Amino acid sequence: MAAVATLNAQTQTVQATLAGGADNEHLCVSVGQPFFQQKTLGDYEFSMGVAQAQWTRDTVYDVITYNTPYTENGFDLPAQTTTHKDSAYLVNGGIYNYDLLRTLYLIVCPEKVTDAFSSGIEYDVLAVTGHCWTKQNLRSPMSDAMSYTCAMYPTVPENYGLLYTWNTAINGTVADNDGYVKGICPNDKWHLPNAEEVDALISNPIVALRSENDWFGPEINTNATDFTAFPAGCYNASSSRFEGLYTQTDWWTMIDPGSGGGSTHKTSLELPCHCYTTLLVTRDPNDAISVRCVMKNEWPE
C-alpha cells in the first residue's frame, strides 16, 4: 500500500495521500511527528507509533498525545514534550473507497494560543465535536472588561475570565472573506463562534460541557468533553447589576437573532443550571458576558 504525507507546522494541517490496499479497518500512513493513538478501532501506522481510527463517513477523530514513553506497539517511542490532551482529526469527504487514490485532510488543534492583547496570557486549546476551542474564557485586558463584583463570591480570572459587552467583544472587526469575525480573539486564525460551530458544540449533553465544580443545582456535571464551562454569570445592563454567578454562563456568538430580536440585539449561548438544555438568548449588546473563540478549519486548496 502506498502512502505519503506532509506536516505543515504553521497551519497545523496534516495532508495524507492514501492509495488502495487497505481493508475496511486498517490503513497505514507515515507522517513522522507527533505520535497519536486513536481511541476507536483500526490502525494508522506513524513513524513514531500507531494511531488507531475507524473509517466512517465524515468522521471526527478525537486523539490523544502521550508525554511518557509508549512501547506497547514495539516502537520504543521517546517521551513527548506535550501533555495529555485531545485533538481533532477532521475527515473532509464521504465514504472511503480503498481501491481509489484518495486525499485525507487532517486538522490538529494547537496545544495553546496567546491572547491578542497580552503576551503573558495563554489559553489552552481543546477539540470539541470537530472544532478547536479555547478551553478558558478570554481575560483580555480591555479597558471596559468587567469582573464579577460580588464580594461574597469572588471569582478566579483564570477559571471565569472577564465579561465583555458586544462592542468590546467585536472590537471593531468585521467579517472576513470566509464570513468569520475575529473580535478580540487571539489571532486571524481565531474568531467568535458562528451558528455551525455552536450547533456542533451543543450536540453534546449540557452536563458534558459544564465544569464538575462550582455549579449550583442538582445536576451531576461530568465535563466529559473537557470544555470546562464555569458558571461565570453576567452583567445585566437593564438592571445595572451582576447576576447568575454559579447558576449560568453565556458567550457571545455570531448567530443572527432574527427579526424578533430587534435590530440592535445579539445572540448569546447560555448554559443554565437546573436545566438539561442549552439556550440561545437574545441580549442587549450592553450586557457583559464571557467570550470563547474557535479556530478556523482551513482545508488546503
PLM region spans:
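Bacterial N-terminal signal peptides
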Residues: 1-4
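A generic alpha-helix preference that emphasizes hydrophobic side chains
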Residues: 6, 22-23, 71, 224, ...
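Proline- and Ser/Thr-rich low-complexity, intrinsically disordered segments
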Residues: 7-11, 42, 47-109
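Residue-level hotspots within well-ordered secondary structure
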Residues: 10-54
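Short, surface-exposed beta-strand/turn "edge" patches of beta-sheet domains
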Residues: 31-41, 86-93, 267-285
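Conserved positions within compact, well-structured domain cores
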Residues: 110-301
